[in-house]
């Protein structure tokens, strides 16, 4: 048990990147010896948010990875990932853990429902996306269970030597 890149610690479901609100690229673990600096923060009457450079986290998979998260004055959340591939394509999984029930309602859209409240999750991407829900049941008997939660999001493939933007909006519904 250790914190190295191939340490058994990362086989624990809750500690792996596939069980968190983040990207997984080419099915690979995030790089342990990476750094994800906050490169910009902003706050105005219209919006507040931050930008994080995830390039070193995904250095084995893509040339560049930047995530911007914005909350606007209407409480709409926008998560934008800008990725740039090199000599290999990037199979990207965008995942969010939620206690809500999820229903895919159309191309690049999903509705989340919890305690009578509803939220729309939409994806605007430069590539084709496949909306997905995943069980949150861990693969190993020794893992803690995650009752009442699922993972939602999408999968997409970014071709070699290409820049792409993946923009997710979470919009409360009345």
Each model region followed by its residue ranges:
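CBM-like, beta-strand-rich accessory domains located in the C-terminal region of large
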Residues: 1-174
């Amino acid at each position: 048990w250790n914190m190295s890149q191939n340490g058994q610690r990362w086989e624990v479901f809750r500690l792996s990147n596939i069980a968190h609100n983040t990207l997984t690229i080419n099915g690979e673990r995030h790089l342990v010896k990476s750094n994800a600096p906050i490169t910009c923060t902003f706050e105005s009457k219209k919006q507040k948010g931050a930008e994080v450079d995830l390039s070193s986290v995904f250095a084995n998979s893509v040339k560049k990875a930047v995530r911007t998260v914005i909350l606007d004055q209407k409480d709409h959340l926008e998560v934008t990932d800008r990725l740039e591939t090199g000599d290999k394509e990037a199979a990207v999984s965008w995942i969010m853990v939620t206690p809500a029930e999820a229903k895919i309602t159309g191309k690049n859209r999903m509705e989340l429902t919890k305690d009578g409240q509803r939220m729309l999750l939409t994806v605007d991407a430069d590539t084709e996306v496949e909306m997905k829900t995943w069980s949150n049941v861990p693969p190993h008997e020794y893992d803690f269970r995650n009752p009442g939660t699922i993972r939602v999001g999408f999968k997409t493939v970014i071709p070699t030597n290409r820049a792409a933007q993946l923009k997710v909006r979470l919009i409360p519904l009345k």
